[in-house]
Amino acid sequence: MRLSRKLTLLPLLLLQPAIMFGQDAHALAGKVDQRYNRMHSLEARFTETYTGAGATRTEGGTLLIKKPGRMRWDYDTPRPKLFVTDGNMAWFYVPGEQQARRSPIKQLDDLRSPLRYLLGKSKLEKELTGLSIASNAKPLNAGGVVLRGVPRGMQDRISETLLEVAPDGAITRIRVEELDGSITDLRFLQQKEDVQIADRRFRFTPPPGVEVVQGTELVN
């Protein structure tokens, strides 16, 4: 799967548990907003599983987020690769390759786009249209609740996004299903808030001799 076929939201609990805890989609979205709007930075381990075209691929690494607008996906399993943005320009590079790809962040066609609400002050209900409790989706973690919606502006590509939300409002999983039937499943572990992250971690300079290619889809 392509990094541009990733992206970025998370699952929450079934309808019955949601009712039991007195939660609805609006209240749950508010809890998520409150958590991430007060946060300045985040570090987490992630796993990403892509299923499509008769194949399944699982990758993993470390995610760094720092406001405003900066994000770094450092893949280390099964091979190193990097997706990074400083808030203006996004880069994708695989060590050892002869090309690095870049795109202005506003032009980027990437499934990570729903994660932009984590990068500034925003509201989940504005980022996802048709936001509701996914009563037929089983959460992976105890006490979790699953939300369903479609990222605004991506209705021509994505049929459904599920977000799993922990009782404290943390997003622990994002599952994105595209119109072609492919599925990207992102899970976030060992989340650390407001950690010190140097600004240089979100800048990228291509190694000598590496060609820079411009495009809106960065990752294969």
PLM-predicted stretches and their roles:
Residues A18-T58, P206-N220:
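N-terminal leader/targeting segments and the immediate start of mature chains
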Residues M39-S41, T58-G60, K66-P68, P78, ...:
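Extracytoplasmic
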Residues Q98-V145:
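Flexible, surface-exposed loop/linker segments and immediately adjacent secondary-structure boundaries
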